[in-house]
Amino acid sequence: MINFIASLLGKLMRWIYDSLAAGGIEPENISYYAIAIIIMTLLVSLITIPVTISTQKQAEQTQKIKPKMDEIQKKYSYDQQIMQQKMQALYKEEGVNPGISSCLMMIIQLLILLGLFRVMNDTKTFVFPEGIEDIRRDFYWITDLTHPDPLWFGLPLLTSLSQFLVTLFSMKTNPQMSEGPMSSMNKSMLFMPLIFFMTFIKLPAGLPLYYTMSSLIRLIIMVIMHFTVKKPKQLDEVNDEKVNNKTSKK
């Protein structure tokens, strides 16, 4: 499975690299190899946009039924098992699957990351079978993206900060993430940036470059959706206004 994903990513990266190389002189401070990783990240993010949108919609639906959730928590606070059963019944009735979309996104990201790890560790096999000796792989202060970033405060730190911003924005814009049965898991996500930092300082720098760009793109999409998509409360106000208009016409 991972080899298959690595093969697809390698072919995509090679196609992007060849397209860039055919276009002219390579920039001085950033190699086509690095640019290919950035463009590949953008393409992968575009492909996973439906999952991102689904995650956001599930969050909005959960927010809409939050009053009912609060009522159940208050009414059955004496028995956690009964409360969980009532919550599950409410989710089923309302067609809400909290956490499913976000878990799916995490699984997709993990599979891609593992595939990319295989590509970065064996670039010669998956991207340049003819050899990589003559291929530039630098990115500003990094001389070779197939090796770890020499600066701990470079890409590993940027990766941690970008992931922290994504998690923080999700929790701030969706209050239900910090309350109810999902609260413990979501709060534990705040520690993930630290884990990423400790991990990425030892891995090929191409991985934190990919993950940083992926997190920033995801954050941009979330911000756009947050400020453009109508919230449940706004939708209710619109529906009430339509009903009032019809009533007044009669």
Question: Where are these predicted regions, by residue range?
Answer:
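Helix-loop-helix
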Residues: 1-250
